[in-house]
UniProtKB/Swiss-Prot annotation:
Protein family according to the UniProt entry: Belongs to the KAE1 / TsaD family.
Gene: kae1
Protein name as annotated: tRNA N6-adenosine threonylcarbamoyltransferase
UniProt cofactor(s): Fe(2+)
Alphabetic keyword roster: Acyltransferase, Cytoplasm, Iron, Metal-binding, Transferase, tRNA processing
Protein's job: Required for the formation of a threonylcarbamoyl group on adenosine at position 37 (t(6)A37) in tRNAs that read codons beginning with adenine. Is probably involved in the transfer of the threonylcarbamoyl moiety of threonylcarbamoyl-AMP (TC-AMP) to the N6 group of A37.
Native source organism of the sequence: Saccharolobus islandicus (strain L.S.2.15 / Lassen #1) (Sulfolobus islandicus)
Keyword DNA-binding in annotation: no
Main location: cytoplasm
InterPro entries: ATPase_NBD (IPR043129), Gcp-like_dom (IPR000905), KAE1/TsaD (IPR017861), Kae1_archaea_euk (IPR034680)
Sites where the protein binds substrate: Y130, L131, S132, G133, G134, D162, D183, S262
Length: 331
């Protein structure tokens, strides 16, 4: 089985190709929109994705050394994400499905992150941290679905850091040589400032932390503010994670999503693993950020259980939660 996956939920347009036997991932091509200033404007994302979609599709097919006719199914991330960006990927997927008579497989973006994590880390039954620009979720698989044990009550961890560095003119670009701008700034900071620390059970809140940090700009060294906001945010996440580990008694902790690439977070998680006698499984950097390979792979798993969708019902779902998705391949 060969599945072509299309990712376009936010700033990245990606096309991946997966097959149902090793090495599983045959291609993983993408192009990421980087704004010249400010944040991501939906109209700019739509324009970028539309412009690069054809090139990325061709590159993926060339990388896999196959033609579109060799593909069995077309998988597409229908949500969650930014509406105009999602529509580009959905439109391309529908067109390919109709033109080449290929069944369409609906994929939840978060499930894509999680499943590529299972593949690349070889985790068996983990507690999962799904951390990205739009999501901060603590989850695990139980009785047919991924059940959420904790999440952000407002903005996501990645979004909070992106907004801060943008507001203080440290970004864009947000990622420089594999490091987030807040990590680079934090390297010269050492003073831990007093900022809000909000953990409620296994849920977290980052909006107050962001607001308080911005109010300190001009009053404290920027490097110390960056250091403090990062350390406090990560410590909040670790406290919520420890509570979930105590509740679930899991012996594996898997981290997926773009924030999983953070070296400083990895170090904290490794320490947590030693304290709790838990194996830490972190998705490789090349699969941490948004990519088409994760959509192709999750689509392949879904297709193996007959999960398809008619083209005329393939609506985008900008607020599609991971705990709303049935997972028949893990029953």
């Amino acid at each position: 089985m060969l599945v072509l996956g299309i990712e376009s939920t936010a700033h990245t347009f990606g096309v991946g190709i997966a097959k149902d036997q090793p090495p599983y991932i045959l291609a993983n091509e993408r192009d990421t929109f980087v704004p010249k200033e400010g944040g991501m404007k939906p109209g700019d994302l739509l324009k970028h994705h539309a412009e690069v979609s054809g090139t990325i599709l061709r590159r993926a097919l060339e990388k896999a050394n196959i033609s579109i006719n060799d593909i069995n199914y077309i998988a597409v991330a229908l949500g969650p994400g930014i509406g105009p960006a999602l529509r580009v990927g959905a439109t391309l997927a529908r067109a390919l499905s109709l033109k080449y008579n290929k069944k369409l497989v609906p994929v939840n973006h978060g499930i894509g992150h999680i499943e590529i994590g299972y593949l690349t880390t070889e985790a068996k039954d983990p507690l999962i941290l799904y951390l990205s620009g739009g999501n901060t979720i603590i989850t695990t698989f139980y009785k047919g679905r991924f059940r959420i044990f904790g999440e952000t009550l407002d903005i996501a961890l990645g979004n909070m850091m992106d907004v801060f560095v943008r507001e203080v003119n440290l970004a864009p670009p947000y990622i420089i040589n594999g490091k987030h701008a807040i990590d680079i700034c934090s390297e010269k900071g050492s003073k831990l400032l007093k900022l809000p620390y909000v953990v409620k059970g296994q849920d977290m809140s980052f909006s107050g932390l962001l607001t308080a940090a911005l109010r300190l700009v001009g009053k404290e060294k920027l490097e110390d503010i960056c250091y403090s906001i990062r350390e406090i945010a990560f410590d909040m996440l670790l406290e919520a994670t420890e509570r979930a580990l105590a509740l679930t008694s899991k012996k594996e902790l898997m981290i997926v999503g773009g924030v999983a690439a953070s070296v400083s977070l990895r170090k904290k998680l490794e320490e947590l693993g030693k304290e709790w006698d838990v194996q830490i499984k972190i998705v490789p950097p090349e699969f941490a950020g948004d990519n088409g390979a994760m959509i192709a792979y999750a689509g392949m798993l879904a297709a193996s259980k007959g999960v398809f969708i008619d083209v005329d019902k393939s609506y985008i779902r900008p607020r599609w939660r991971v705990d709303e998705v049935d997972i028949p391949w893990r029953n």
